[in-house]
Amino acid sequence: MGMRMMFTMFLLVVLAITVVSFTSDHASDGRNTAANDKASNLMALRDECCPDPPCKASNPDLCDWRS
């Protein structure tokens, strides 16, 4: 195999890896968004619930880390 052919194969491999990496990154964006939304909801619930003693007592798994 000549040098041009080897270089062409190298470029094709790099292109294929880039395409696969790019598409898999975009596929995970939906999962990341869902996880971020869940974390935001838990933080909002914690901020509202933990200062309230009855709510804090009924949700120890949410509030115990700060006490």
Curated annotation (Swiss-Prot):
Tissue expression notes: Expressed by the venom duct.
Propeptide residues according to the Swiss-Prot or TrEMBL record: 22-46
Molecular function via GO: acetylcholine receptor inhibitor activity; ion channel regulator activity; toxin activity
Protein keywords: Acetylcholine receptor inhibiting toxin, Disulfide bond, Ion channel impairing toxin, Neurotoxin, Postsynaptic neurotoxin, Secreted, Signal, Toxin
Region (Lacks the Ser-Xaa-Pro motif that is crucial for potent interaction with nAChR): 51-53
Disulfide bond sites: C49-C55, C50-C63
Principal subcellular localisation of the protein: secreted
Cellular localization per UniProt: Secreted
Gene Ontology cellular-component annotations: extracellular region; host cell postsynaptic membrane
Matching InterPro entries: Conotoxin_a-typ
A Pfam family: Toxin_8
Extent of the signal sequence: 1-21
Comment block on domains: The cysteine framework is I (CC-C-C). Alpha4/7 pattern.
Cited function: Alpha-conotoxins act on postsynaptic membranes, they bind to the nicotinic acetylcholine receptors (nAChR) and thus inhibit them. Has possibly a distinct nAChR binding mode from other alpha-conotoxins, due to a different three residue motif (lacks the Ser-Xaa-Pro motif).
Family note: Belongs to the conotoxin A superfamily.
Official protein name in the record: Alpha-conotoxin-like Qc1.1a
Naturally occurring in which organism (per UniProt): Conus quercinus (Oak cone)
Biological classification of the source: Eukaryota, Metazoa, Spiralia, Lophotrochozoa, Mollusca
